[in-house]
């Protein structure tokens, strides 16, 4: 086991809670920072996150804390000042103001590990790029943890494999030891861009896969969407400097397969319900956890257009979310695209008939 660390997990959703449990199981001192005082009190008393992970026992060594208004107040500020590692488990679209609050509280060598999966809609930036904006001097101490990992299965200690990417290879190897247990295997990588993009775009493709399932199509259709979705994700990754090989790994193909086929996938559930005819507004209003793929679809579609990268499945999901076309029409549009060589790596968009 690695030396015990003082770790703060920001965000008490299902994944933040599961990561906190994982690290506490590994013998580390873990604080879980929430916004809800009621939930923090419940976790400390009952060792259960009854809102986001009901029915699962949380390691009793985890201590939940909260600030009334922001992370800068009272106990959270105290624990952050002593943290050697801070885990960012806040939804991507809400992360930037959290980073701004964090900066003055952290020690010089504090390590930031991101678990959020998305691209900021307003700026089209990844989390690493947000770190560069808000705390550039810390980017050498930044890593991202991603891969096929449902929180519920991590809580049950079912064998899981993920990847941790850090541009500092030595630091990445150090972190993979901290995040590994006999049932949770962590691989290391230096391709931060590729790992972040794989984690973000798979949620878009998962919505498409859910739409297909909701329409009553078969496994053939779902796997076709997954495979071609991986192809367009790889094209975007190459345009942004990522290694194409990363997308065949855990944060690419692995996470894509899990999210497109798993019953626990929130993004697939969004697509499934869209395919069955529900309105997007009604779907989102009924969910108590965020499906990152909705906002990510808008960001990825805009980014692809800006970079002139052909991403027809992403475009189709965007148009369904916008109500431009029906789910069934979107599938038909994809099937009626110009026939081509499978290995063709387009630099020019070839689907231009939908705005």
From Swiss-Prot:
NCBIfam families: PRK00094.1-2, PRK00094.1-4. It is an enzyme of class 1 (oxidoreductase). GO terms for biological process: carbohydrate metabolic process; glycerol-3-phosphate biosynthetic process; glycerol-3-phosphate catabolic process; glycerophospholipid metabolic process; phospholipid biosynthetic process. Coiled coil: none annotated. Catalyzes the reduction of the glycolytic intermediate dihydroxyacetone phosphate (DHAP) to sn-glycerol 3-phosphate (G3P), the key precursor for phospholipid synthesis. The lineage of its organism: Bacteria, Pseudomonadati, Thermodesulfobacteriota, Desulfovibrionia, Desulfovibrionales. Its main location: cytoplasm. Belongs to the NAD-dependent glycerol-3-phosphate dehydrogenase family. It is found in: Cytoplasm. The keyword Cell wall biogenesis/degradation does not apply. Keywords: Cytoplasm, Lipid biosynthesis, Lipid metabolism, NAD, NADP, Nucleotide-binding, Oxidoreductase, Phospholipid biosynthesis, Phospholipid metabolism. This is Glycerol-3-phosphate dehydrogenase [NAD(P)+]. Its EC number is 1.1.1.94. It catalyses: sn-glycerol 3-phosphate + NAD(+) = dihydroxyacetone phosphate + NADH + H(+); sn-glycerol 3-phosphate + NADP(+) = dihydroxyacetone phosphate + NADPH + H(+). GO terms for cellular component: cytosol.
């Amino acid at each position: 086991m690695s030396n015990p660390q003082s770790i703060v997990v920001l965000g008490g959703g299902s994944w933040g809670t599961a990561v906190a449990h994982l690290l506490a199981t590994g013998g580390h001192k873990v604080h879980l920072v929430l916004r809800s005082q009621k939930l923090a009190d419940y976790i400390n008393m009952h060792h259960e996150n009854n809102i986001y992970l009901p029915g699962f026992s949380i390691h009793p060594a985890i201590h939940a804390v909260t600030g009334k208004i922001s992370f800068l107040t009272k106990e959270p500020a105290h624990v952050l000042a002593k943290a050697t590692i801070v885990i960012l488990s806040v939804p991507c679209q809400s992360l930037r103001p959290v980073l701004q609050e964090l900066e003055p509280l952290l020690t010089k060598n504090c390590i930031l590990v991101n678990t959020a999966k998305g691209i900021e809609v307003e700026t089209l930036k990844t989390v690493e790029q947000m770190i560069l904006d808000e705390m550039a001097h810390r980017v050498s101490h930044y890593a991202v943890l991603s891969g096929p990992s449902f929180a519920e299965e991590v809580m049950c200690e079912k064998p899981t494999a993920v990847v941790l990417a850090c541009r500092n290879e030595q630091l990445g190897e150090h972190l993979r030891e901290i995040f590994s247990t006999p049932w949770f295997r962590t691989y290391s990588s230096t391709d931060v861009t590729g790992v972040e993009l794989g984690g973000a775009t798979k949620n878009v493709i998962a919505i498409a896969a859910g739409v297909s399932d909701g329409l009553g199509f078969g496994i053939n259709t779902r796997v076709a969407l997954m495979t071609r979705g991986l192809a367009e994700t790889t094209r975007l990754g190459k345009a942004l400097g990522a290694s194409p090989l990363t997308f065949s790994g855990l944060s690419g193909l692995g996470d894509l397969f899990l999210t497109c086929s798993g019953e626990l996938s929130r993004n697939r559930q969004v697509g499934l319900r869209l395919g069955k005819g529900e309105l997007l507004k009604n779907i989102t209003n009924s969910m108590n956890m965020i499906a990152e793929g909705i906002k990510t679809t808008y960001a990825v579609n805009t980014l692809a257009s800006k970079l002139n990268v052909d991403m027809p499945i992403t475009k189709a999901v965007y148009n369904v979310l916008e109500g431009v076309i029906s789910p069934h029409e979107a599938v038909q549009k994809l099937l009626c695209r110009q026939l081509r060589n499978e290995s063709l790596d387009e630099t020019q968009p070839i689907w231009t008939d939908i705005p």
